[in-house]
Amino acid sequence: MGKIIGIDLGTTNSCVAVMEGGKPVVIANTEGSRTTPSVVAFTKTGERIVGEPAKRQAVTNADKTISSIKRHMGTDFRVSIDDKKFTPQEISAMVLQKLKADAEGYLGEKISEAVITVPAYFNDAQRQATKDAGKIAGLDVKRIINEPTAAALAYGLDNEHEQKIMVYDLGGGTFDVSIIEIGDGVIEVLATSGDNRLGGDDFDERVTRYFIDEFKKAEGVDLSTDKMALQRLREAAEKAKKELSSATTTNINLPFITATSEGPKHFDLNLTRAKFDELTHDLVERTAIPVQNALRDAGLAPSELGKVLLVGGSTRIPAVQDKVKQLTGHEPSKSLNPDECVAIGASVQGGKLAGDTGAGDILLLDVTPLSLSIETMGGIATRLIERNTTIPSKKSQIFSTAADNQTAVDINVVQGERQFAKDNKSLGQFRLDGIPPARRGIPQIEVTFDIDANGIVNVSAKDLGTGKEQHITITAGSNMSDSDIDKAVREAAEYEAQDKKRKDAVDTRNDADSIVFQTEKALSEVGDKVSADEKTAVEADLNHLKDLVAKANPEVMSEGEVEDMKAAKEKLMNSAQALFAKLYESAQGAAGAGPDMSGAGPQGDTYAGDDVVDGDYREV
């Protein structure tokens, strides 16, 4: 069986890991970082870029740069880029494709399977949307697991003694808290709670708003309407937040933030940790209720917790750590890397599914975060499965008709904790018809809820009198039909093919540029060791390739232009062979006294041939 990678698909940053040699390994991306910004951008030429390169160009391309798309998963939100609309699943799939490609580059093999994590408080629609994103990216999602559970799995690898822990997970866009029992090879989630609209992005937004207000007071200019200035302020706010985790004050200096009739304006402000805490106090306070709810649902007092684990980059904020200590009475543990532990846990689960012995025999028992109900007479939400029920789970209940001679029933499936169906999230509706006419209350209709290990819901309704049955896998919330997903898969494959063509163009141009440089250097050093005719032939081929390199733009090179450059490169290599041979002989004859050209010819190991990328490159 092939490798199953573990992916933490985050709001602001994502991470990928894999079990290798019996241990989880975090895979660095092509830029050398162990986490990848969950950012996608489209350039003016229509090229797609993902991760750090996309984040770097956001200031000058704010309209076509997409971030924090995870907050829209499972909704009908669309991103408009030029004439095309993208679903959150499609944008997320682009991030997943990047992570998949990085994993393939590291492992040297194709990857087709993954375990992907989601916030514990994600509803069914959001989980299904995440699976759809994986499918679009070319991944068979073997399991969806909750982020706090994945963190506990990473922690449980090295902690066998029995204990109850709290995982406090404050990420870029979501907040989760889970109470988990670890012991005897079992990781059991006792309760979970959270807030899907609370995370580091909200802290950044508060600071950005403060910057805007302060600048308006000082200069009379509203920067909120200037997209480029706003993006610079957001990036500065994020940077300031991070710096204030270790420093008590930071300076924000943004020259030429805007211009008025008076001339250019500069932004210069000192922000203290005390002011930051004041701006974000209510956000930190919002984490208290989910913590209290999770403890109550688990039937535990804070003193019964053995440890509190911090997960997510936002837990580095000192005020957050202080709040955790206040709520639990425990000094929070920092034994896990908050940016990587979720991906590590996902890779452990992937290793288990792939049969990797290094993943151990840990049994994972997770829960559904929200109650599942159907709408009954009067709009009541009648619960079949309570929140914090261990999954997978199956529950059936008998219902009947509400009116005489009723021949059909509409089943409205809802998720949430409110008493009335309309106040909860509707996951989908379906109809069971063909019920024989009878007095109300006589027909026996069995409704069954079945939640799989991914937390995804299947619902069926059966008329026990006739045996007629209808069932539905809840997918309505993701707003993508099977045909939509198939289309997105094809488009994602096209993007992947375009990326490969573009990389081939970049590599070919860089390779050709390197050969031009080495040939020019060789011509200047060879002197009269080769004939004038040989030099002329080399110079003709050199000038032809040099001209192609000068005109080439890898972003828009056609396949024909790439092939022409490859052919010109081969021609120059062949004609310059004698040139490099003479230099090699000269170097040997000089017994190392002259310049070291060993291996400089086309047969030498250090010649910049097809597999060598020139060091002087432009990041793309």
From Swiss-Prot:
Region Disordered: which residues? 590-620
Q: Which Pfam families match?
A: HSP70 (PF00012)
Q: Which GO terms fall under molecular function for this chain's record?
A: ATP binding; ATP-dependent protein folding chaperone; unfolded protein binding
Which residues are modified to Phosphothreonine?
A: 174
This entry's comment on induction and repression of expression is:
By stress conditions e.g. heat shock.
Keywords, ordered alphabetically: ATP-binding, Chaperone, Nucleotide-binding, Phosphoprotein, Stress response
Function (record text): Acts as a chaperone.
HAMAP family, sorted: DnaK (MF_00332)
> Per the similarity annotation, which family is this?
Belongs to the heat shock protein 70 family.
Q: From the Swiss-Prot or TrEMBL record, give the protein name.
A: Chaperone protein DnaK
Question: What is the organism of origin for this protein?
Answer: Lachnoclostridium phytofermentans (strain ATCC 700394 / DSM 18823 / ISDg)
